[in-house]
């Protein structure tokens, strides 16, 4: 079994659900305290043992490339005495992994975005980190999927039980318990209508795939929303290629395409921030007295 060392981050979305913040800035660059959202995704991959990361961009998103590149002018300024920590942080961003970029010339859906990564992943298994989904926790979700892949030898999906009223916004998996937080998956459906749901287990932003997915994607027709859905390709794999493993992951999920969840991410991660956490907690307590 090949070791999982590659990750793909589709980040070409327009971010229409969080306009006007994304009118001139990619959704992935929305800040959570002092880091853009996409940096949290890259850091999760690195913490999971990933060494090579492909970020899939759309038009006018070169700012993401700039963020993960060296910045000689800034580094020169930060070389002054007393700014060593900031310099170290900036250098670390550029050096944390081998990060590559490719443009998705047409935004035809998540499945199409993943197909763009074929030359990058080759014959290797790889993790897909959805660009909308920041998941915060001590145990990175990518690492949880990699462990499941090593145990069961099948593609994996990070799942969570969502309220039944919300299943139609996500996908629904047909699951059979294996042990602990692992389930066998032999079917799934994207954005099911009422009565089509298999369960209230939905994929929330992380999957681990094998190269066989590319042939399936090449023959996947547009589905929900008129887009090529990755879920449809994974459903085909689950039904006809030996099934998948669902991992009910641990970690707090934030949808960066949801304004309320963006604010929740700001507040909850600020409370855990090593520099401002305690001061922010005190400030928040005072503010809550006014509610």
Model-identified regions with their sequence ranges:
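Positively charged, low-complexity intrinsically disordered leader regions
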Residues: 1-7, 279-285
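N-terminal glycine-rich phosphate-binding loop and ensuing alpha1 helix
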Residues: 2-79, 83, 140-141
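Residues at the starts of beta-strands that form the adenosine-phosphate
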Residues: 6, 51-53, 98, 125, ...
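Well-ordered alpha-helical segments embedded in enzymatic catalytic cores
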Residues: 37-40, 112-116, 233
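Residue-level signal for inorganic ion chemistry
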Residues: 38, 64, 117, 132, ...
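Conserved beta-loop-beta/alpha segment of the NTase-like Rossmann-fold superfamily
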Residues: 74-76, 84-175, 217-218
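Catalytic-core segments of class I nucleotidyltransferases/pyrophosphorylases
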Residues: 127, 146-150, 177-253, 259-282
């Amino acid at each position: 079994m090949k070791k999982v060392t590659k990750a793909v981050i589709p980040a070409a979305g327009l971010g229409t659900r969080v306009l006007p913040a994304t009118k001139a800035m990619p959704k992935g660059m929305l800040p959570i305290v002092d880091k853009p959202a996409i940096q949290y995704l890259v850091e999760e991959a690195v913490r999971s043992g990933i060494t090579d990361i492909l970020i899939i961009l759309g038009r006018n998103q070169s700012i993401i490339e700039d963020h993960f590149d060296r910045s000689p002018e800034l580094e020169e300024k930060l070389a002054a005495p007393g700014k060593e920590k900031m310099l170290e942080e900036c250098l670390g961003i550029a050096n944390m992994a081998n990060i590559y970029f490719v443009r998705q010339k047409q935004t035809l859906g998540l499945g199409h975005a993943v197909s763009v990564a074929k030359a990058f992943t080759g014959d290797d298994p790889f993790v897909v980190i959805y660009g909308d989904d920041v998941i915060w926790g001590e145990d990175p979700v990518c690492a949880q999927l990699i462990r499941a892949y090593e145990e069961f030898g099948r593609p994996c999906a990070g799942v969570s039980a969502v309220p039944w009223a919300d299943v139609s916004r996500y996908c629904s998996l047909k699951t059979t318990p294996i042990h602990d937080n692992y389930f066998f998956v032999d079917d799934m459906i994207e954005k099911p209508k009422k009565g089509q749901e298999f369960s209230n287990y939905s994929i929330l932003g992380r999957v681990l795939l094998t190269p066989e997915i590319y042939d399936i994607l090449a023959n996947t027709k547009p589905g929900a929303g008129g887009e090529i859905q990755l879920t449809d390709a994974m459903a085909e794999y689950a039904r006809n290629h030996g099934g998948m493993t669902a991992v009910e992951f641990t970690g707090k999920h934030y949808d960066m395409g949801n304004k309320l969840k963006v604010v929740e991410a700001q507040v909850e991660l600020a409370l855990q921030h090593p520099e401002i956490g305690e001061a922010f907690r005190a400030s928040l307590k005072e503010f809550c007295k006014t509610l």
